């Protein structure tokens, strides 16, 4: 079967899946979030490349934000004021890596509707860029350290030691903290918090964690964690979505499911909902077509999908839903602003 045939089948199955009548609870959730802004996410286009797409939070009004068949686009993030957009642009032949995506290709800055896109630096430069709260700077992460860069000029303003941080850096909404994945604290793949002024670090959660992001209050984080001791998946277990206070004093399950790894947790701007992806494959499977996304109310958590006998024994009070099923994608980002939909999807190659 050719790649085009596979993609055609994929789009048909996705469409058929969305056409299934949802339960009344899921239908109410969909109606509740339908008008709450837009979600940007990367996904395979019908041409086989990765483009950026927009959709309403209920999955409706899906449209292309970029149409660049000679490139792949990944890792989009709206600025906190929703006026700007950052993403990585890769060569069409380069597979998106679930672990290296923040340092692949070149960084692109654009208006939130995709217009006036401009390449910042060369390939591999400005890795793991994350917007400052005011959109005037972004923080980057490399072997040289955590650097704070002027968003207009590209000038490095200051640099802090990276303290074991190595990927998935995100600046807090209040500007005081950074969260990221660190090989520190006596183990690997920890979630850690860094003081953005002093560079001091502390662990939020340790061992087999990834894809951290902030709640709007900057006091809590959402992240993926594979708790040790699981017997399923041949003893390897499954990655689950958790939340914790940023000081690392408490944590709780948000969503999990035996049979799918849950990644890319992103909390809505009002702190009431969370987006995520669920994939049988590790890292959300960006090498192929990503994975189905989901949306739930945080107040409904914890939720456990499917039979998941082992998980339900550990979390007897967990619910089974509702979870709104969304199209396949990867690393989504949500804004309540209407700005992203102001332009039609005619984005062309970014300028240098």
Predicted regions and their residues:
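Accessible peptide chain termini
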Residues: 1-2, 59
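Sec-dependent signal peptide recognition
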Residues: 2-9
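Hydrophobic h-region of N-terminal signal peptides that target proteins for export
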Residues: 10-19
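Sequence signature of WD/YWTD-type beta-propeller architectures
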Residues: 20-352
């Amino acid at each position: 079967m050719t790649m085009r045939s596979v993609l055609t089948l994929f789009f048909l199955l996705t469409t058929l899946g969305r056409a299934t009548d949802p339960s009344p609870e899921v239908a109410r959730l969909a109606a509740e979030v339908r008008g709450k802004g837009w979600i940007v996410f990367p996904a395979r286009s019908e041409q086989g490349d990765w483009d950026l797409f927009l959709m309403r939070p209920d999955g409706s009004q899906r449209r292309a934000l970029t149409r660049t068949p000679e490139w792949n686009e990944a890792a989009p993030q709206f600025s906190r004021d929703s006026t700007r957009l950052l993403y990585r642009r890769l060569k069409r032949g380069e597979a998106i890596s679930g672990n290296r995506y923040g340092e692949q290709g070149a960084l692109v800055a654009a208006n939130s509707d995709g217009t006036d896109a401009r390449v910042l630096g060369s390939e591999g430069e400005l890795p793991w860029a994350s917007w400052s709260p005011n959109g005037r700077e972004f923080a980057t992460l490399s072997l040289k350290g955590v650097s704070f860069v002027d968003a207009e000029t590209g000038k490095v303003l200051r640099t802090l030691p990276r303290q074991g941080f190595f990927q998935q850096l995100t600046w807090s909404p209040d500007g005081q903290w950074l969260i990221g994945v660190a090989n520190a604290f006596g183990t690997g793949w920890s979630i850690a918090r860094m003081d953005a002024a002093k560079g001091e670090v502390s662990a939020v959660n340790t061992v087999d964690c990834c894809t951290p992001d902030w709640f709007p209050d900057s006091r809590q984080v959402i992240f993926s964690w594979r708790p040790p001791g699981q017997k399923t998946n041949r003893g390897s277990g499954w990655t689950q979505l958790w939340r914790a206070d940023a000081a690392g004093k408490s944590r709780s399950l948000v969503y999990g499911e035996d049979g799918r790894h849950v990644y890319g947790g992103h909390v809505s701007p009002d702190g009431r909902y969370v987006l995520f992806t669920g994939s049988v494959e590790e890292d959300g499977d960006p090498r192929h077509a990503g994975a189905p996304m989901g949306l739930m109310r945080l107040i409904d958590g914890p939720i456990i999908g499917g039979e998941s006998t082992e998980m339900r024994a550990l979390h007897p009070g967990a619910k089974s839903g509702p979870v709104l099923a969304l199209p396949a994608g990867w690393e989504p980002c949500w804004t309540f602003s209407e700005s992203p939909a102001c332009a039609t999807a005619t984005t062309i190659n970014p300028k240098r």
